[in-house]
Amino acid sequence: HRGGQGSDAKTGDGAGILTQLPDRLFRETVRHISFPKKGDYGVFMMFLPREERERMRLERTLESIILTEGQDVLGWRTVPVRSEVLGSGARRTEPVIRQCFIGAQAMEGLTFERTLFLIRRAFERESEQLGLEQYVLSSSSETIVYKGLVTTDQLRAYFDDLRDERYQSGFGIVHSRFSTNTFPSWKRAHPNRYLIHNGEINTLQGNIRAMRGRERRLAETTYGNRAEEVLPILDETGSDSSMLDNAFEFLHLS
C-alpha cells in the first residue's frame, strides 16, 4: 500500500504489522517472567507517556484492574527500539512502548479474550478520568500489533523484536498509511487491533447511527449486566477505519 511521509522525509504517516503472539521470543528473552502455556497468557501492547510518574500511575491502574478481574499480572517489559532511525517529527512524539503480560485464571479461549477486552475498556475509562494519555495497540492472547510513526523501511529497523529470528508467526499483515482526512500520529498508524483498512467510508455517519441504535441490545446479549462496561462500542474520536475496527472487534468477541 502507498505510504505517506512528512516534510522531513524520515517521518512516515505510520506503518505496522499484526502477527500471532511470538511465544518463543517472549519465553527466551523475557527471563524475569515464568510463562504459562501458550494461550494461557495475554499481552497488552501499549504506548505510554515518557513522563515517568504518569507512566507509573497508568501501569499501577492497569494492574489494579487486572487483579479486580481475577487475572494475574505476570510482569512488564519495555519493548526494545532504536529511536535513532526515526525522523525528527516522529521523535518529538515518540512514546514509551511497554508490554504487560497477563496470566489467565480459570478461563481460556474466547472467555479470556472477552476478559482482556473488559480490562482494556476499564483501563481506557480510568485513564481518561485521570487525564492521562495512553493507547493500547493490542490486548490479546492470540495476536499482537507492532506499529509506529515510521515508514515500512524503518519498521523492522525500529523494533528489535522484528529482526529476531525467534519472532515466529503463522502470518503477518502489514500496512503503510497515507494519511488523508486525519493527521498522522503514533496511535493512528495501522494495523488497528484486528483490521487493516484504507478508510474513506462514505456511509460513516449512517453506520455510526446504526451502531448507536443497536449497541446496547448487542452488548447485553453477550455481557449481560456488564454491558455498560463496553459501551459505547465506537470511539468516535478515532478515524473511520479505527471505528470499523471497534465494531469488528466487538462482533468478533460476541
Task: State what each model feature region is.
Residues 1-254:
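Conserved short alpha-helical segments that host acidic/polar catalytic motifs at enzyme active sites
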